[in-house]
């Protein structure tokens, strides 16, 4: 497989961008080697500058649920572009997308469009603090909610300790208001509430974790978090930036029967264009400016092209489309598990809907600690062998792979065939 042009571009990029990229995971740091520079995409495939063709399971980290360059999405975006790229004023397209969101998630009584998932989650945290008059928030170890300072915090030495910054540049005075607990561990969360309940404004979680690889919620966990929030007067924030409109027409909330106080969106609702949103209970959202005193604003919020892309994509995601996604995803997961067994490589294929991760572990993976115990060296060998055989997976053991309605049975068969060869390579690594 030729990579000369990607290598040359990466050399230039390293002179222009930190680490040669504009988002860290793209640099292949977790797997080694040179990232592929992508020149175009169509359907379920992407093509790099050297002419290599890959079945794409990154899908721009989730947004491309109907595949790349879907004609209906392209048409609606092109129509919007002809009308103007940004107005700095209300536009009809905001209402079209918002009505579609509320039709599928009626508990989102009011919402605010923003320009990224990070902006959505940091805004939701501010709203929760303003609404409750409390300062502390709780997140779960391994859950990623964007790059905002309050959320770049990992677990301390115990569930009752204050948060510690997970990045230089995050002040300790900010991080101390972020408390942490292990995902899937309700007793640990109960202890956090026992210690700090009167000061906790909200609990935020990924209902299905995607940023430690796919971690599946244990039965009763998500509702248990909701019940603890109710008991202690904290808001329940469900971060659906990754899962929203991907796992079902009602997102993870619809799939698991959740009714959060606030929910955040991104990715799929922009179909590849920059977008985010937060919304929820009417009484909470009515505290947001200009209706209320909690300030939030954005120059490009409700961008008409992003609204058009999201509207077109959501219209395409019918119940039949979700059934197709489920069948394809199940076939891929089963094929990967079987291929690993043939090579005598122990793996755990965690999947919910069209999100999945192949964990190189002989034990169940259900929280950050069990994910971190995986064999990342084997994953690296597997990743590069898959890449060599035309399957583009996330370049990290700790990320989710995605499928789209553009994927086909042939794509899945090609990927499983590549996996048989790739697991054989992984088996050579200790």
UniProtKB/Swiss-Prot annotation:
The protein's enzyme class: isomerase
Swiss-Prot/TrEMBL catalytic activity: (S)-4-amino-5-oxopentanoate = 5-aminolevulinate
InterPro entries: 4pyrrol_synth_GluAld_NH2Trfase, Aminotrans_3, Aminotrans_3_PPA_site, PyrdxlP-dep_Trfase, PyrdxlP-dep_Trfase_major, PyrdxlP-dep_Trfase_small
This protein's pathway: Porphyrin-containing compound metabolism; protoporphyrin-IX biosynthesis; 5-aminolevulinate from L-glutamyl-tRNA(Glu): step 2/2
An example Gene Ontology CC term for this record: cytoplasm
Record's keyword terms, sorted: Cytoplasm, Isomerase, Porphyrin biosynthesis, Pyridoxal phosphate
Compartments where found: Cytoplasm
UniProt modified residues of type N6-(pyridoxal phosphate)lysine: 267
A Gene Ontology molecular function term of the record: pyridoxal phosphate binding
Gene Ontology annotations of biological process type: protoporphyrinogen IX biosynthetic process
Pfam family for this entry, one: Aminotran_3
NCBIfam families, sorted: hemL, PRK00062.1
Family designation: Belongs to the class-III pyridoxal-phosphate-dependent aminotransferase family. HemL subfamily.
Protein name: Glutamate-1-semialdehyde 2,1-aminomutase
Species of provenance: Anaeromyxobacter dehalogenans (strain 2CP-1 / ATCC BAA-258)
């Amino acid at each position: 497989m030729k990579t000369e042009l990607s290598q040359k571009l990466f050399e230039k990029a390293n002179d222009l961008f930190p680490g040669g990229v504009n988002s860290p995971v793209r640099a292949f740091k977790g797997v080694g080697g040179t990232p592929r520079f992508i020149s175009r995409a169509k359907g379920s495939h992407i093509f790099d500058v050297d002419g290599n063709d890959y079945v794409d399971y990154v899908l721009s980290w989730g947004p491309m649920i109907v595949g790349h360059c879907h004609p209906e999405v392209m048409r609606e975006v092109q129509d919007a572009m002809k009308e103007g790229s940004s107005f700095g004023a209300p536009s009809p397209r905001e209402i079209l997308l918002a009505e579609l969101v509320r039709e599928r998630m009626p508990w989102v009584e009011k919402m605010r469009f923003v320009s990224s998932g990070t902006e959505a989650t940091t805004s939701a945290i501010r709203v929760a603090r303003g609404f409750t008059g409390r300062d502390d928030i709780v997140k779960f170890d391994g859950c990623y909610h964007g790059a905002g300072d309050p959320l770049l915090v990992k677990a301390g030495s115990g569930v009752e300790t204050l948060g510690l910054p997970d990045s230089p540049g995050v002040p300790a005075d900010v991080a101390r208001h972020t408390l942490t607990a292990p995902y899937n561990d309700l007793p640990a969360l109960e202890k956090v509430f026992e210690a700090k309940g009167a000061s906790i404004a909200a609990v935020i979680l990924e209902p299905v974790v995607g940023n430690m690889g796919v971690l599946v919620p244990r039965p009763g966990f998500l509702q248990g978090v909701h019940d603890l929030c109710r008991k202690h007067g904290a808001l329940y924030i469900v971060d659906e930036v990754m899962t929203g409109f991907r796992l079902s027409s009602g997102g993870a909330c619809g799939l698991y029967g959740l009714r959060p106080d606030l929910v955040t969106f991104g990715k799929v609702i922009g179909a590849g264009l920059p977008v985010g949103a937060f919304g929820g209970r009417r009484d909470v959202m009515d505290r947001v400016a200009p209706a209320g005193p909690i300030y939030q604003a954005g120059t490009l919020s409700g961008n008409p092209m992003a609204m058009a892309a999201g509207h077109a994509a959501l219209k395409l995601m019918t119940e039949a489309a979700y059934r197709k996604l489920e069948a394809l995803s199940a076939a891929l997961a089963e094929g990967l598990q079987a291929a690993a067994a043939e090579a005598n490589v122990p793996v755990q294929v965690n999947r919910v809907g069209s999100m999945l991760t192949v964990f190189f572990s002989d034990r169940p993976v259900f929280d950050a600690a069990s994910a971190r115990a995986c064999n990342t060296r084997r994953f690296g060998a597997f990743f590069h062998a898959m890449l060599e055989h035309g399957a583009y997976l996330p370049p990290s053991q700790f990320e989710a792979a995605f499928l789209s309605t553009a994927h086909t049975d042939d794509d899945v068969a090609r990927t499983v065939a590549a996996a048989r060869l790739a697991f054989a390579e992984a088996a050579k690594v200790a």
